[in-house]
């Protein structure tokens, strides 16, 4: 893995969140550096998805700060928020593809929203990214219902990357994929990171992904940050202090991770 830059791109400070009377987070703090692949782990209901949503303006925290590129996103005006998120790509768990659009049209959606590109340029950039994520030219004119789960994930990545983001947010990127496809997806993430110095934040239950392509991960439990470090740190803490890691994951992939233990 490439060396991680010292520049902090994301900083979460003392984040609290709740739904009604149900407390989700109680003072979560961490940072993400440029060029780092960081994962958010935790058991079902631990607040992984809510944390990600707080980081991408979908859930407002009840307290605390979320800084992207040094700006507290929840204190910015809408126009300034948009400028920040023009530098980010987001790929949701099921791709969130438009069913009435072809692969080529889906990938070009964000470029068209920028309004600064001609139709020809949008098409050329879209084709480039479709091929970069490992899909053949014959996929250009397919519709989402004609794609496998793995292909949909790759289209989602192509669309998120088409605007050349500095940060990529991923929600369960290998969920629903067979082991081979999940492994190839991990390779894609590493290729993007190494070739573009991309910073990636992902929610995952996939322990092989953690082993293969994650530089560091945080672990949520009972609304708190239970762990923040790399795999070596995790192994050391599990052996010396004990961690309830066995109950945190439901993925069938994890052989490499557990061998490390």
PLM features: residue spans?
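Conserved ABC ATPase "signature" region
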Residues: 120-138
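H-loop/switch region of ABC-family ATPase nucleotide-binding domains
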Residues: 204-205
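Conserved ABC ATPase signature
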Residues: 143-147, 151
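Conserved catalytic motifs of ABC-family nucleotide-binding domains
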Residues: 164
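Catalytic Walker B motif of ABC-type/P-loop ATPase nucleotide-binding domains
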Residues: 168-171
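Helix-to-loop junction immediately C-terminal to a conserved catalytic motif
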Residues: 56
């Amino acid at each position: 893995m490439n060396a991680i830059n010292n520049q902090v791109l994301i900083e979460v400070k003392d984040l609290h969140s709740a739904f009604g009377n149900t407390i989700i987070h109680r003072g979560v703090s961490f940072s993400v550096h440029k060029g780092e692949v960081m994962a958010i782990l935790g058991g079902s209901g631990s607040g992984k998805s809510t944390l990600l949503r707080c980081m991408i303006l979908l859930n407002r925290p009840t307290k605390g700060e979320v800084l992207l590129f040094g700006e507290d996103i929840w204190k910015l005006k809408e126009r300034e928020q948009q400028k920040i998120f023009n530098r980010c790509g987001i790929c949701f768990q099921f791709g969130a593809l438009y069913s009435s659009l072809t692969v080529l049209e889906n990938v070009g959606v964000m470029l068209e929203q920028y309004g600064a590109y001609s139709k020809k340029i949008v098409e050329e950039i879209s084709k480039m990214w479709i091929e970069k994520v490992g899909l053949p030219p014959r996929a250009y004119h397919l519709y989402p219902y004609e794609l496998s789960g793995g292909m949909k994930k790759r289209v989602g990545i192509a669309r998120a990357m088409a605007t050349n983001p500095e940060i990529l947010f991923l929600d369960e990127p290998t969920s629903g994929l067979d082991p081979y496809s999940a492994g190839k997806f991990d390779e894609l993430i590493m290729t993007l990171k190494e070739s573009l110095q991309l910073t990636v934040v992902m929610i995952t239950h996939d322990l092989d992904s953690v082993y293969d392509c994650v530089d560091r991960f945080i672990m949520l439990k009972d609304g708190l940050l239970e762990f923040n470090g790399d795999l070596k740190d995790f192994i050391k803490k599990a052996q010396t202090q004990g961690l309830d890691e066995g109950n945190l994951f439901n993925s069938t992939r994890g052989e490499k991770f557990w061998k490390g233990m």
